[in-house]
Amino acid sequence: MANQGGFKKKTFGWVIKDLQTHRRCSVPILIGDSYWRLVALPNENGYFSLFLEVNMELIPCGWRRYVEFRMTIVNHISPIHSVDKKGWRWFDENTKNWGFKDMIPAVILNNVNVGFLLNGEITIIAEVEVHEFIDTLNASQVEELSDDSSEDLQNKDNVTIEVNGFQVLDSQVDQVNAIFEKHPDLISNFSLKNQHIRNAYMHALLDLTKTLSKSTKELTVEDMNEADNTITDLIKAGLNLDWLRQKFDQALEKQIAYDTRIGELEKQVKKRKLAVTELEADLEKEKAAASASLMLFD
């Protein structure tokens, strides 16, 4: 087994304010003897991609480091639904970056109801541990040091319960069970395996049902448009939501009818108020004329 010469570990945050740019890079951070940064591709083939990259221009020839890293996209509504992944890799002149092409679907990340987007920004937390080894490790020894680089981490700080392949909070279990009881074919075409992404889609569905349970007075046009987009995204992901789409379309049709009728009545009220104002003005004129006429007999 090789002797470990030491390691440097650092945790840092990155707030991305513009998700429309094709490529975004964080400020370089010094960890050990090298500078590291995060590189994001906001919409690479439908996914938000995230990578760790070392600045090869500032390191000596023959440099090689074993790096363990963990990346978290923070969910501001429910931390349990934060997307959290870890990986390991040897970085050298042939491998200067490594990460996750499918960190999270772009439609989920950009949905304001899901919780990753806050005031148009997303927050990423990176934990990077750079190891310096005196000798070179062989492949079997590296296996002893770390898990597979594609493994997802579970958030150990929160207790969750599995319901039909989804990790949900204890307070959400009854709601999720009720949905599956009424719609047992909900995930018959849902083939995503990544646990965190599956959880994110379920969270979006639960948030959607919460939004649609409000009275029409509480829902704005923006709420309805956002709900419409969310249903479309969830159906594209493979969830069988024809029943929800039908209910939503019916509710939207009624809402449009109500809004139209309310608009017509408001116009009539304005017209009648204007007519009353004109009548009041005529009344005052008549009173003034009558008063002037009576003064002729004084």
From Swiss-Prot:
Keyword Coiled coil among record annotations: yes
Domain of life: Eukaryota
InterPro entries, sorted: MATH-CC_domain_protein, MATH/TRAF_dom, TRAF-like
Coiled coil stretches, renumbered: 240-288
Keyword line: Coiled coil
Gene3D superfamilies referenced in this protein's UniProt entry, alphabetically: Apoptosis, Tumor Necrosis Factor Receptor Associated Protein 2, Chain A
Pfam family, one: MATH_2
Residue intervals of the MATH domain: 9-128
Protein name: MATH domain and coiled-coil domain-containing protein At3g58280
Lineage: Eukaryota, Viridiplantae, Streptophyta, Embryophyta, Tracheophyta
